[in-house]
Amino acid sequence: MSTAARKIRLLMLLRRNGVSDTGVLRAIEMIPREVFVPPTFHDQAYEDTALPIGHGQTISQPLVVGLMTQVLDLHDRLRVLEIGTGSGYQAAVLSRIVRRVYTIERHRPLLMEAERRFNTLRLHNITARLGDGMRGWPEAAPFERILVTAGGGAEPPADLVKQLAVGGVMVIPLGPDRREQRVVRLRRTESGLAREDLWPVRFVPLLPDVAPEAPRAERAS
């Protein structure tokens, strides 16, 4: 089966399973997922499955990407903060819908690979940086939308809530542990947060700080 046929099959699966927003479907169609997975998994790029990308991280299942993007309720004037760049695929999808994407990754090698992909695909409205996602990006705040692509514990990080604009939406997996996570949509109001629990998921945990880098191999003397 050709890559084009695999992509069409995946888009049909997404439609059958609740991804109905034409802007989201168009963005997923535009972004070549095979660019964001290791070469070993190129033949699985358009399967509806999460795939390993190294450093204990995964590229999310396309259905999860589609549904989480859809519930953000996006339009082309928005600035979006993404926590957890990973392969860069989710940020790339967002970039085809909104004005600007800010994305934070704690693993330097993943960030460098993602930035290379953004440049290759000429996705110039994405700004990425290495950092602690739990602290957000205060100098660029407030954001109209925040998407967290890692399990955020029982409550959303306080710094991210502060950086969400009034009227803005945050979509984040929350739960006491990985076995009990749910995607939650939070809308910031003048008086606090309105919470809507959506569907169960399993994401890698949201961790503080920048990940330590593996030590360089010593040169042979």
Swiss-Prot record:
Keywords: Cytoplasm, Methyltransferase, S-adenosyl-L-methionine, Transferase. One of its GO terms (molecular function) is protein-L-isoaspartate (D-aspartate) O-methyltransferase activity. It is found in: Cytoplasm. PROSITE patterns: PCMT. It is an enzyme of class 2 (transferase). It comes from the Bacteria. It catalyses: [protein]-L-isoaspartate + S-adenosyl-L-methionine = [protein]-L-isoaspartate alpha-methyl ester + S-adenosyl-L-homocysteine. Its EC number is 2.1.1.77. Gene3D superfamilies: Vaccinia Virus protein VP39. The keyword Kinase does not apply. The active site is at S60. One of its GO terms (cellular component) is cytoplasm. The keyword Methyltransferase applies. InterPro entries: PCMT (IPR000682), SAM-dependent_MTases_sf (IPR029063). One of its GO terms (biological process) is protein modification process. PANTHER family: PROTEIN-L-ISOASPARTATE O-METHYLTRANSFERASE, PROTEIN-L-ISOASPARTATE(D-ASPARTATE) O-METHYLTRANSFERASE. Belongs to the methyltransferase superfamily. L-isoaspartyl/D-aspartyl protein methyltransferase family. Catalyzes the methyl esterification of L-isoaspartyl residues in peptides and proteins that result from spontaneous decomposition of normal L-aspartyl and L-asparaginyl residues. It plays a role in the repair and/or degradation of damaged proteins. HAMAP family: PIMT. This is Protein-L-isoaspartate O-methyltransferase. It comes from Rhodospirillum centenum (strain ATCC 51521 / SW). The lineage of its organism: Bacteria, Pseudomonadati, Pseudomonadota, Alphaproteobacteria, Rhodospirillales. The gene is pcm.
